[in-house]
From Swiss-Prot:
Catalyzes the condensation of (S)-aspartate-beta-semialdehyde [(S)-ASA] and pyruvate to 4-hydroxy-tetrahydrodipicolinate (HTPA). This is 4-hydroxy-tetrahydrodipicolinate synthase 1, chloroplastic. One of its GO terms (cellular component) is chloroplast. Keywords: Allosteric enzyme, Amino-acid biosynthesis, Chloroplast, Diaminopimelate biosynthesis, Lyase, Lysine biosynthesis, Plastid, Schiff base, Transit peptide. The record marks 130, 193 as: Part of a proton relay during catalysis. Residues 1-62 form a transit peptide. It catalyses: L-aspartate 4-semialdehyde + pyruvate = (2S,4S)-4-hydroxy-2,3,4,5-tetrahydrodipicolinate + H2O + H(+). It comes from Triticum aestivum. It is found in: Plastid, Chloroplast. Its main location: plastid. Tetramer of modified subunits derived from two genes in different combinations. Pyruvate binds at residues 131, 284. The active site is at 217 (proton donor/acceptor), 245 (schiff-base intermediate with substrate). Residues 1-51 are annotated as: Disordered.
Length: 388
């Protein structure tokens, strides 16, 4: 059985939401007297001669003039990236987030993964997406990882932060923070679980689109609600609307590309045909975590049915259980990340771990990330973390 780390006291015993549990730090910790972190007026205590003019228990309210230093808003961002600059990206990797044995981010391993993506030809990375387990992060962790990626690699690869949420309030706040720390674009899923109407979807996305280049993510298998074409068409006129990561299939891809809307396939096993037969711009890929060079060839070098066929067993293996279970298992067996899982994710069973090693041999170890030989890990090699 995998090693299950014993529980430790949770630092936030009464969380109510990801934002209330761990709000992302402001990039400007110091504000002028009389303003809150949001820039609103706050009562300021007065003393001495001035205090005599104020009745006991009362406070004077400080005035804020246009010359006062106010916190950065969403219109003032660290990196200005054109929407067209995002629309042109063909290979975007939904990058894995690796962990240390205590459940914290393994930034050394993460940096190595990003460098490998750059060297393999990826043009962008999704930080904290489904594959990167953003839903298992506090917003503090989430924004920190986006900022870290921008600061270390933003000059060489586009950083797209997954700042979407089923709460419009959280999506707005996280997206402001993401652009403030320098992300080039945002990825936004439609509100899940607490589903809304068509008008609600449009209103939700309209709240975040003014902040910067935006990719909308349609994945009904996870959200249990399809984003219908009328929603995307209603939003397509917005200058910050970069396009859609579409997981419904080829017909939907063609529906949008015929209208001039940029589309990235969200399905590795369909991305070749989506790109070359149905007009997709490219792919937002899971498999490129493992074989970035081959995925680059698949998106840049024209139709290649033979290469696509060669990669299909790997692509199907990756999704034999919900993503990112397969990817986490694969990267651990390649020796590029520690075999640490944040629960509720657990490694694939032994027979699937054996199958992966055979797939690596068939495709060629030299095409995969890392330098170590692929090996079958035992159950006891894995560490499962419940407090993180």
């Amino acid at each position: 059985m995998p090693y299950l780390q014993p529980p430790r006291p949770h630092p936030h015993p009464h969380p109510t939401s990801r934002l209330s549990r761990a709000s992302p730090p402001s990039p400007f910790p110091f504000f002028p007297a009389g303003t809150s972190r949001s820039g609103r007026l706050q009562p300021v205590p007065v003393s001495g001669h001035s205090a005599s003019r104020v009745s006991k228990g009362k406070f004077a309210v400080a005035a804020v003039t246009l010359d006062d230093y106010l916190p950065m808003r969403s219109t003032e961002v660290k990196n200005r990236t054109s929407t067209d600059g995002i629309k042109s990206l063909r290979l975007i990797t939904a990058v894995k987030t690796p962990y240390l044995p205590d459940g914290r981010f393994d930034l050394e391993a993460y940096d190595s993964l990003i460098n490998t993506q750059i060297n393999g030809g990826a043009e962008g990375v999704i930080v904290g997406g489904t594959t990167g387990e953003g839903h298992l992060m506090s917003w503090d962790e989430h924004i920190m990882l986006i900022g870290h990626t921008v600061n270390c690699f933003g000059a060489n690869i586009k950083v797209i932060g997954n700042t979407g949420s089923n709460s419009t309030r959280e999506a707005v706040h996280a997206t402001e923070q993401g652009f403030a720390v320098g992300m080039h674009a945002a990825l936004h899923v439609n509100p899940y679980y607490g589903k809304t109407s068509t008008e609600g979807l449009i209103s939700h996305f309209k709240e975040v689109l003014p902040m910067g280049p935006t990719i909308i993510y349609n994945v009904p298998s996870r959200t249990s609600q399809d984003i219908p074409p009328p929603v995307i068409e209603a939003l397509s006129s917005y200058s910050n609307m970069a396009g859609v990561k579409e997981c419904v299939g080829h017909e939907r891809v063609k529906c949008y590309t015929d209208k001039g809307i940029s589309i990235w396939s969200g399905n590795d096993d369909e991305c070749h045909d989506s790109r070359w037969k149905y007009g997709a711009t490219g792919v937002i890929s899971v498999a490129s975590n493992l074989v970035p060079g081959l995925m680059h060839s698949l998106m840049f070098e024209g139709e290649n049915a033979a290469l696509n066929e060669k990669l299909l067993p790997l692509m199907k293996w990756l999704f034999c259980e919900p993503n990112p279970i397969g990817l986490n298992t694969a990267l651990a067996q390649l020796g590029v990340v520690r075999p640490v899982f944040r629960l509720p994710y657990t490694p694939l069973p032994l027979e699937k771990r054996v199958e992966f090693v055979r797939i690596v041999e068939a495709i060629g170890r030299e095409n995969f990330v890392g330098q170590k030989e692929s090996r079958v890990l035992d159950d006891d090699d894995f560490v499962l973390i419940s407090r993180y």
